[in-house]
């Protein structure tokens, strides 16, 4: 159902803590339109033994971090580059430290993995791209504290269009 309470930056730690930190990318769509998905992801990550955090951007702007994909989609390459650069500058130190970057919105994650490295053509953008995982990839590839058991029922899965297009 519709949530009218946006996801606030104060809902997550802003620096890595604990033995298994994971950077949770709070994308614009999830922040404003499906904040409960972020809150649920935070609970699942914590239950799995991770300590999710979301770093704040520098003080150049009060705007939350964004991948810039929407700017690219309307041909505003300069603004997309500036938006992406701000994100990469914030995430690069964590990527260099080997901290996974996990998110919920496949189109934004694929922008981080594919479009931003091509757009910025920097070592930092490449390093960030290497650490990006979907929420599902993190839970499937990392050892977790979750005790998941196979369901004895059929389930339908509707994949995101960007996941299908990129074979994820």
Stretches with model-predicted labels:
Residues 1-168:
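Iron-sulfur cluster-binding electron-transfer modules in prokaryotic oxidoreductases
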């Amino acid at each position: 159902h519709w949530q009218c309470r946006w996801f606030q930056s104060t809902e997550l730690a802003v620096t890595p803590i604990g033995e298994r930190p994971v950077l949770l990318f709070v994308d614009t769509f999830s922040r404003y339109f499906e904040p409960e998905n972020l809150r649920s992801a935070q609970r699942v990550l914590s239950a799995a033994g991770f300590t999710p955090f979301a770093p704040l951007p520098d003080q150049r702007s009060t705007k939350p971090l964004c991948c810039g994909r929407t700017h690219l989609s309307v041909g505003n390459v300069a603004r997309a580059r500036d938006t992406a650069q701000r994100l990469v500058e914030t995430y690069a130190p964590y990527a260099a430290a080997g901290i996974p970057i996990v998110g919920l919105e496949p189109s934004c994650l694929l922008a981080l993995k594919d479009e931003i490295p091509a757009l910025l053509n920097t070592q930092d953008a490449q390093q960030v791209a290497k650490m990006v995982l979907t929420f599902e990839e993190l839970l499937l590839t990392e050892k977790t504290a979750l005790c998941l058991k196979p369901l004895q029922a059929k389930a339908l899965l509707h994949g995101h269009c960007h996941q299908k297009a990129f074979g994820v």
